[in-house]
């Protein structure tokens, strides 16, 4: 973790209305620059629950957890009805469309190859 120095307080300390300590355990995962994303995350989970999740996570998984927490908050902001599940559904739908398009292209390539072979 970096010393406070010139950095701004982390999002967790801002929402808890406390001074961000020099070696804040949350500054690395929720820096000031992510405050707009953290706001939606805070609305969804609440800072106490975020702190609890981060404290129970193994050190090597904390960055992944913080990223997941913020992504989930953003997903619910963008799609208040379906949240992350809606995001996954949209991605799966796009994959299906791209697979169908790829299949069409493969068929056209196959047809063109057959035409070329007939002319040789």
Swiss-Prot record:
It comes from the Eukaryota. InterPro entries: LOB (IPR004883). Residues 8-109 form the LOB domain. Belongs to the LOB domain-containing protein family. This is LOB domain-containing protein 8. The lineage of its organism: Eukaryota, Viridiplantae, Streptophyta, Embryophyta, Tracheophyta.
């Amino acid at each position: 973790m970096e010393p406070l120095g010139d950095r701004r307080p982390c999002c967790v300390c801002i929402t808890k209305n406390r001074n961000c300590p020099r070696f804040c355990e949350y500054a690395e995962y929720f820096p000031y620059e992510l405050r707009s994303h953290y706001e939606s995350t805070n609305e969804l989970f609440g800072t106490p629950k975020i702190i609890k999740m981060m404290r129970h996570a193994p050190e090597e998984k904390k960055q992944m957890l913080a990223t997941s927490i913020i992504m989930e908050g953003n997903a619910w902001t963008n799609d208040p009805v379906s949240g992350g599940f809606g995001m996954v559904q949209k991605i799966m739908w796009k994959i299906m469309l791209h697979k169908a398009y790829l299949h069409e292209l493969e068929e056209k390539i196959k047809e063109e190859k057959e035409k070329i072979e007939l002319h040789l």
